[in-house]
Amino acid sequence: MNISKKVFHLFLAAIMAFSFAACVSVVQAAPFTAPQKLDPYLYYMEYADYAPDLTTGEHVKLGFACSAVRNGNFYGRNLDLDYADVPEFVIKIAANEAEGRYASIGLAAILTLKSNEFDKVSEADLLALPNITFDGINENGVAMNCNVAPAIDLDFATLRSTNYGKPRIHAVSVVRYVLDHAESAAHGVELLKNMDIYGGYGSWGLHWMLSDEKETYIIECIDGELVVRNDTDNIMTNFYVNYGSYSKYAA
């Protein structure tokens, strides 16, 4: 073997070794703790960082009813799944001052798997999991949740955009975005007015209840517009608050 071939082989070996080391270092540096199983359906994880993906949630399995309630400093919801056997996660996100992100804690679920299929969850899935946070509260006391709502009487195509030309965000990722960046409920509303919200849960729309210690808002995408209502009932179900015949079932 001549000198040039030896040099080439040594160079190739070095590249392979470096690549392997880099892969190992990436695995070791995963910015979240290993899922801690709290019961057959619930896990707990802490994140130093995550992979923001505002397109998450384009195709999410449906089939449940839910209500959200706020009473003073108490904020809660029920989630009446008709297929309750899914892995759910309590997700604690660390603050990141450089990225303007506040600390928060919330709930997410992988609705396309059964609880006994947890071994099918990849590291990439876990890294992106915070994007599908359904409910949560941040360090400023801003609490938010999303519920599905029937879009039968709406032109659902118009729900694909609320503010054309602004940065786009999938409806499923709205809670995560607000928890990360909102200083108050009113600030959360202003943040969403500057985003183009699109999508839903399959053929269903989504709406949100956003609260802090002072006030509550119901936020909905109606025929291509973001509609915000300052709400004094402090309750939201699976029916639109700001639209037609459905609004009478809102609370």
Predicted regions span which residues?
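Bacterial N-terminal signal peptides that target proteins for export
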Residues: 1-11
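Glycine-centered signal
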Residues: 1-2, 24, 244
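Hydrophobic core
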Residues: 16-24
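Extended amphipathic alpha-helical segments with heptad-repeat/coiled-coil character used for oligomerization
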Residues: 202-251
